[in-house]
Design a protein with these regions (language model features):
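Donor-nucleotide binding loops and adjacent catalytic segments primarily
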Residues: 39-49, 156, 163-243, 276-280, ...
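Active-site-proximal region of nucleotide-activated glycan assembly enzymes
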Residues: 2, 29-32, 51-53, 112-161
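An aromatic- and histidine-rich active-site surface loop
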Residues: 39-43, 95-114
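Acidic donor-binding loop of glycosyltransferase active sites
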Residues: 93-95, 238-253, 260-261
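Structural loop-to-beta junction motif characteristic of Rossmann-like glycosyltransferase folds
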Residues: 116-117, 241-242, 259-267
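An amphipathic, basic-hydrophobic alpha-helix
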Residues: 66-95
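Conserved nucleotide-sugar phosphate-binding/catalytic loop shared by glycosyltransferases and other
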Residues: 3-8, 25-75, 209
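Short amphipathic alpha-helix
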Residues: 13-24
C-alpha cells in the first residue's frame, strides 16, 4: 500500500509528517511526500531517503494577499492539483494524509477530485483556513483539541529522552522553527545574569537572527549552544532543565513528552491567536 503525505511550511506541520512517516514504515506502508519549494519542506525532507518519492511544488500561501493575488493563487493551486493527480496515478496512491499548511492544498484538492480518502490532522487549537475548508469533505479529521480527542503524534525519541529535573543548570530558549525576535531579545538580555548564576544557555534563534545572536554572545564572552534549526531537537531538550518557548502545537507536545518544565510565551500575532489557546489547553488540563 502507498499513501501520500502532504503539507508543511513550518516545523509544526513537518514534525507531524515525520511522525506519520515513521508510523507508516512500521506498518509496511510506503509514503510519497508532496510539499512546497517554499517554506521549510525541503530543509526537512529533501534528503529523507525513507520516502518512496518526494515532490516539492511551487505552491505558496495566500495570507495577506490581495483579492487578485488570492484568485491567481487559487488557479495555480488547481493547476498543481492536476499534477498531483498524475502523481497519484503513477504511484498508485490509495489515500492522502494532510497536515495542513499551504503546501497541502494541491494534493488535498487532488484527493477530492480523485475520490481518494482524505485524512487531515489539525495541530492547533484553532483550525487553519485550509483545514476548515476541507474538514466537511475529509474521511477523518484528527485533533488533540476537539471533543473527540485524538492523540497528538510525537516522535518516540522525545519520550525516550524524558527525565526528571531536580536542579537548574541549563535553560533552552525556543522560538520555533522560524525563530522569535522577542524570545531572542529576552535570551540576550538574561544572558549576563544567567552566566553569573552559572546557568548555561541553549538557544534556538532562527535563521534570520543567527549571526546577530552569535555575535552578541561572543561580545559577552558567553559560550551558548546557539542554533537556527535542528532535526534533533530532542537532544537539545534532553540537556535542558527549563524551557522558555513559543506555544506552537508540535513544540508544546514535544516538551510535554520530554517532561521539560516550560514557560510559554505565545506568539500574539499567530492566526486566530492559536498559540495562546494551545497553551491555555494545557493550563485547563491541570
Amino acid at each position: 500500500m502507498t499513501i501520500a503525505l502532504t503539507g508543511g511550511g513550518t516545523g509544526g506541520h513537518l514534525a507531524i509528517v515525520r511522525c506519520l512517516l515513521e508510523s507508516a514504515i512500521k506498518k509496511n506502508i510506503e509514503c510519497v511526500y508532496i510539499g512546497s519549494q517554499n517554506g521549510q519542506d525541503k530543509a526537512w525532507f529533501e534528503n529523507e531517503v525513507r520516502f518512496k518519492e518526494k515532490f516539492f511544488l511551487s505552491s505558496k500561501g495566500v495570507v495577506n494577499q490581495s483579492k487578485f493575488d488570492k484568485i491567481s493563487s487559487l488557479l495555480h493551486t488547481l493547476k498543481l492539483s492536476k499534477d498531483c493527480r498524475e502523481i497519484f496515478k503513477k504511484y498508485h496512491i490509495q489515500a492522502v494524509f494532510s497536515v495542513g499548511g499551504y503546501s497541502a492544498a494541491p494534493a488535498s484538492f487532488a484527493a477530492l477530485f480523485s475520490h481518494l480518502p482524505l485524512f487531515i490532522h489539525e495541530q492547533n487549537s484553532k483550525s487553519g483556513s485550509l483545514n476548515m475548508l476541507l474538514k466537511p469533505f475529509a474521511t477523518k479529521f484528527f485533533s488533540a483539541f476537539e471533543k473527540e480527542i485524538s492523540p497528538y503524534p510525537v516522535a518516540d525519541k522525545f519520550f525516550d529522552n524524558a527525565r526528571i529535573r531536580k536542579e537548574l543548570k541549563n535553560i533552552i530558549f525556543l522560538g520555533g522553527s522560524q525563530g522569535a525576535s522577542f524570545i531572542n531579545e529576552l535570551a540576550l538580555n538574561l544572558a549576563p545574569k544567567l552566566q553569573e548564576q552559572n546557568i548555561k544557555i541553549i538557544h534556538q534563534c532562527g535563521k534570520n537572527d543567527f549571526e546577530k545572536c552569535k555575535k552578541h554572545y561572543q561580545s559577552l564572552n558567553i559560550q551558548a549552544d546557539i542554533f537556527d534549526f535542528s532535526l534533533n531537537l530532542e537532544e537539545k531538550m534532553k540537556n535542558a532543565d527549563l524551557a522558555i518557548s513559543r506555544a506552537g502545537a508540535s513544540t508544546l507536545f514535544e516538551l510535554c513528552a520530554n517532561t521539560l518544565p516550560t514557560i510559554f510565551i505565545p506568539y500574539p500575532y499567530a492566526a486566530k491567536n492559536h498559540q495562546y489557546f494551545n497553551a491555555k489547553f494545557l493550563q485547563d488540563q491541570a
